[in-house]
Amino acid sequence: MLGMSLREAAAALRLGQIKPTELCQKCLSFIKETSFLNAYITVTEDFALKQAAEADERFIQGKPLGDLDGIPIAIKDNFSTAGIETTCASRMLKGYIAPYNATVVQKLFDQGAVFMGKTNLDEFAMGSGSTDSIFGPVKNPWSYSRSYIDKTSLSHHAAKDDSDWVITGGSSGGSACAVSAGTCYLAIGSDTGGSTRNPASHCGVVGLKPTYGLVSRHGLIPLVNSMDVPGIVTRCVDDAATVLGVLAGHDPYDSTTIQDPFQPFSLPEKVDVRNVCIGIPKEYHAPGLSAEILSLWSETADLLENAGAKVVEVSLPHTPYSIVCYHVLCTAEVASNMARFDGLEYGHRSDIDDSTEALYAATRREGFNEVVRGRILSGNYFLLKRNYEKYFVKAQKVRRLIADDFVKVFNSGVHVLLTPTTLGDAAPYLEFIQEDNRTRSAQEDVFTQCANMAGLPAVTVPAALSSRGLPLGLQFIGRAFCEQQLLTIAKWFEKQIDFSPLQFNRDSENGNIVQQYSKSASSV
């Protein structure tokens, strides 16, 4: 039951094969069994059971609220949830309880979704490994899979080193982990430069970043206002389309959302790609791209071409400048957004209050980790009067050129772009943290941040297992507000691949998940 897709679970609920409370209890039990993964910051057990009991009554009366009624979900802990702690995985907001629900959260609740808890992340979503949370790093569930154990010749009698488990990617690593492990059927993440797609790729699930403005950001604690988008993590493309239909549309609380009504859509069961033109950006042959990803990318292009699609090489000439441009704009907006955390209104407040300036400085020093403080410093540097035109304004101009590159390609007749999602499979934790956050983020975001810069929809789909038995994903980038076309092509690819979901390595005697990595890497 826990391995089903969202739509399969919804069908089982409608047919009475299982009750919402039974499904909720199964998920809660599995959350406890897999707690070593550290996917959740807060588990809302009582709240979930109450919601599930209410769903039971609706199903008895034959009046379910929608496709998500009774479906267990999880929310990244940078979305506001009324009455439930929202921490952003930071000391700055530890203990903070928002007075309202984010719009996406409220829309899910209005559909009857059952809220299992808040998922772990890099502090304030600044990272690409889910390793910089005050609640400890998130462990990739594939570290405990049969495929990884077999490929790396590990057994539960050996390899008791933390370096043997691999990262989830980030910053929405908890959300991707929760869906991949089977503790919920849907998780909401945020995506500023790839923060939903990156961990989805590393965890072998589907990660959708909608077009900027299609889904409300109200209640998402901002990182970069001009790029932040709520992301959707599911087990299959059809599920992502279902959830998008619930979340998309205008929100009076978010002036950047579209004004026109959004029409939910279902993807066709049979997809024909013979009239589709797929673009392969030549600039995405980036340094560090693994041979496995390169081969997979090429094989997928051939697969599409053999099915009748037109596959053409295209150029996005300003791509080489994109990651640097992204860094300037990202840190500048971070510096602005983080200014609100001053110890006066909400969040952490230092005891050092000899003066207002001393309070500000101590609060931010105690509340933010080094990564956040470093990005604030970088952003403030770019925003200095003497640097503003040279860095920030120039980066804005380059961003426009990057967006124009995509417009030209799509206007040439290309429907969707096919690219890698990441440079390779997930790195071991101890290897990942050897390099600083900034370097790692630049490496991990190289293929994903362009879609955020241009405001385009993009989805990553699991495609294969690496030689180490870990998931590899490929990314499809579509035209603005053309999610239906994008997801239809992604579904076709998904059906051709038929990717096998995670199978935990279990003890043959007691059936428990084998945890060969016995030492805890978490510290709060």
From Swiss-Prot:
A GO BP entry: mitochondrial translation
First-listed, main subcellular location of the protein, grouped into a coarse class: mitochondrion
Keyword Transcription regulation recorded: no
EC number(s) stated in the UniProt entry for this protein: 6.3.5.7
Reaction catalysis annotation: L-glutamyl-tRNA(Gln) + L-glutamine + ATP + H2O = L-glutaminyl-tRNA(Gln) + L-glutamate + ADP + phosphate + H(+)
Keywords in alphabetical order: ATP-binding, Ligase, Mitochondrion, Nucleotide-binding, Protein biosynthesis
Keyword Protein biosynthesis in record: yes
Location of the protein in the cell: Mitochondrion
Active site, renumbered: 76 (charge relay system), 171 (charge relay system), 195 (acyl-ester intermediate)
InterPro entries: Amidase, Amidase_dom, AS_sf, GatA
Pfam families per the UniProt record, alphabetical: Amidase
Database matches in Gene3D superfamilies: Amidase signature (AS) domain (3.90.1300.10)
Molecular function, one GO term: ATP binding
GO cellular component terms, A-Z: glutamyl-tRNA(Gln) amidotransferase complex; mitochondrion
Top enzyme class: ligase
Subunit annotation: Subunit of the heterotrimeric GatCAB amidotransferase (AdT) complex, composed of A (qrsl1), B (gatb) and C (gatc) subunits.
Its job: Allows the formation of correctly charged Gln-tRNA(Gln) through the transamidation of misacylated Glu-tRNA(Gln) in the mitochondria. The reaction takes place in the presence of glutamine and ATP through an activated gamma-phospho-Glu-tRNA(Gln).
Family assignment from sequence similarity: Belongs to the amidase family. GatA subfamily.
Protein name: Glutamyl-tRNA(Gln) amidotransferase subunit A, mitochondrial
Source organism of this protein record: Xenopus tropicalis (Western clawed frog)
Gene it is expressed from: qrsl1
